[in-house]
């Protein structure tokens, strides 16, 4: 009796999801509607709804460089969330190498670079027509705080196999993400503050994607693990996540912690472009 019932239940579930597949997934976030796509994984009747390139903050351009991330601008149209956002500005060869070396996806992602990078991707196996609340896992990519991107890591298999909502996030890298004058004019750690902004967005919006904002795990590898460690220690991250997995890398990794006066080095760089450095404020503004 059990086997026929199980077969019928499986067929019913497949038929229900087949109906959902006739139209792409549409979710209303606090900033506006996003349109994703269903992707099926071999061996699973239930597809995964995938949303790519959702903005969680304003583009950090112009006067927003070297400042706190600002909330994303709302939109009054349906935003297409079916293509990957650009990687943050970085060395193209190194970025391509890291992308190809560490990716878990089969297809190649065209290399696009931009300072406009504060986007996240969501992979959810939840039935968005119901009030499902699945655990959430937020992935922070590695790359030495210099290279890398969310698009390198495909959350499809993890979402389908473990029945969790997977979020992969991006943040500012290199000098744009970690430049500091060592004082209040430009305290630095902009990249880590971007990660906090993404976690705030998750708290505010992930329930609409079938995720449980009260069960968020952050995890990352290499310098992504360092970022996890930083967030665990930061009082600014209180109540934004509930579990943490640091896959190598910690907050006090020696190569990532530098002390000293940044002004002499900055003066050398600015002389190359014939700019005068008078104050930390002018340094931040002209960088």
From Swiss-Prot:
GO molecular function: carboxylic ester hydrolase activity
Database matches in SUPFAM superfamilies: alpha/beta-Hydrolases
Subcellular location: Secreted
Regions crossing the membrane: none
Protein keywords: Glycoprotein, Secreted, Signal
Distribution of this protein across tissues and organs: Expressed in placenta.
Secretion signal, residue range per the UniProt entry: 1-18
Chain positions carrying an annotated carbohydrate: 80
One GO CC annotation: endoplasmic reticulum
Biological process annotations from GO: anatomical structure morphogenesis; lipid catabolic process
Alphabetical list of InterPro entries matching this protein: AB_hydrolase_fold, CarbesteraseB, Carboxylesterase_B_CS, Type-B_Carboxylest/Lipase
Domain of life: Eukaryota
Record function comment: Has no esterase activity.
PANTHER family: CARBOXYLESTERASE
Family: Belongs to the type-B carboxylesterase/lipase family.
Protein name according to UniProt: Putative inactive carboxylesterase 4
Annotated gene: CES1P1
């Amino acid at each position: 009796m059990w086997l026929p019932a199980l077969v019928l239940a499986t067929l019913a579930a497949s038929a229900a999801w087949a109906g959902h597949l006739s139209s792409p997934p549409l979710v209303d976030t606090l900033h506006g509607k996003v349109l994703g796509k269903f992707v099926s994984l071999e061996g699973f009747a239930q597809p995964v709804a995938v949303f790519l390139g959702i903005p969680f903050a304003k583009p950090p351009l112009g006067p927003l460089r070297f400042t706190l991330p600002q909330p994303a601008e709302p939109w009054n149209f349906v935003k297409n969330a079916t293509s990957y956002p650009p990687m943050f500005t970085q060395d193209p060869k190194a970025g391509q190498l890291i992308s190809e070396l560490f990716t878990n996806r089969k297809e190649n992602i065209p290399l696009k670079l931009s300072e406009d990078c504060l986007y996240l991707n969501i992979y959810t196996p939840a039935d968005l027509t119901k009030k499902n609340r699945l655990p959430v896992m937020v992935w922070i990519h590695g790359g030495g705080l210099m290279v890398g991107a969310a698009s390198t890591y495909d959350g499809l298999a993890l979402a389908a196999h473990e029945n969790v909502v997977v979020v992969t996030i991006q943040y500012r890298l290199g000098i744009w993400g970690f430049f500091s004058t060592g004082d209040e004019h430009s305290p630095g750690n902009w990249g880590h503050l971007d990660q906090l902004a993404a976690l705030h967005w998750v708290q505010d919006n992930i329930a609409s994607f079938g995720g449980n904002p009260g069960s968020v795990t952050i995890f990352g590898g290499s310098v992504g693990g360092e970022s996890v460690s930083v967030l665990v220690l930061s009082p600014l991250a209180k109540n934004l996540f509930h579990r943490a997995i640091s896959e190598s890398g910690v907050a006090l990794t020696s190569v990532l912690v530098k002390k000293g006066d940044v002004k002499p080095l900055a003066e050398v760089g600015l002389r190359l472009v014939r700019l005068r450095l008078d104050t930390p404020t002018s340094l931040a503004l002209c960088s």
